[in-house]
Design a protein with these regions (language model features):
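Non-heme Fe(II)/2-oxoglutarate
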Residues: 1-85
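Catalytic core of non-heme Fe(II) oxygenases with the double-stranded beta-helix
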Residues: 84-184
């Protein structure tokens, strides 16, 4: 597992882990995610009224903290386990982004010390398909960090950092799936 740590101008951190799982586990996570009952994200209600056809699909996983840790093998990922120690799972969900989906900067939580875990579920993703995750400074005046949705990448970051996915390219053949969770 390859780890990189990035400190933003406000002192908040982003931890990036690559090659977290073998291909078989990546595929099992993706297949499980694809069987969840997706709904239109409530944040897109205004888009639905305007009959926009491309939107973000989202679903709560319904996993307990123990189930989530087991599925994501948190206990086998020592650096991630250490970051999440003394924290409780608040919520977890899956997003399926498509091209032309509306994306907005947001924070996952508003409690100091909360951490977000973002896992890119796709087993294949071409650089030309876009779908990057972008983190901004607190007043949204500049971009501080960008991550390519590399298959098998796991990112842990301060939940207060404003971030958003960028839209996927129209040439991407599938949704860009992410497993998300917030810990406090």
């Amino acid at each position: 597992m390859i780890e990189n740590e990035y400190e933003l101008s406000n002192g908040r951190k982003i931890y990036v882990f690559r090659e977290v799982y073998d291909y078989a586990h990546q595929l099992s996570l993706l297949k499980w995610s694809m069987t969840r009952p997706f709904n239109f994200s409530p944040s897109n209600e205004g888009m639905l009224v305007g009959q926009k056809t491309d939107t973000i699909l989202s679903c709560q996983t319904g996993l307990s903290e123990d189930q989530f840790k087991e599925m994501m093998r948190i206990d086998q990922l020592d650096p991630v386990k250490k970051l999440l120690s003394n924290k409780k799972l608040n919520r977890n969900w899956i997003n399926a982004n498509v091209s032309k989906a509306p994306t907005f900067f947001h924070s996952d939580a508003f409690v100091e010390g909360s951490l977000s875990l973002l896992y890119y579920l796709n087993c294949e993703w071409n650089l030309s398909w876009d779908g990057y995750t972008v983190w901004a400074n607190d007043n949204l005046s500049s971009i501080e960090h960008i991550e390519y949705p590399e298959p098998g990448k796991l990112v842990v970051f301060d939940s207060l950092i404003p971030h958003k996915p960028t839209s996927d390219s129209p040439i991407s053949p599938s949704f860009r799936f992410t497993m998300n969770s917030v810990w406090s």
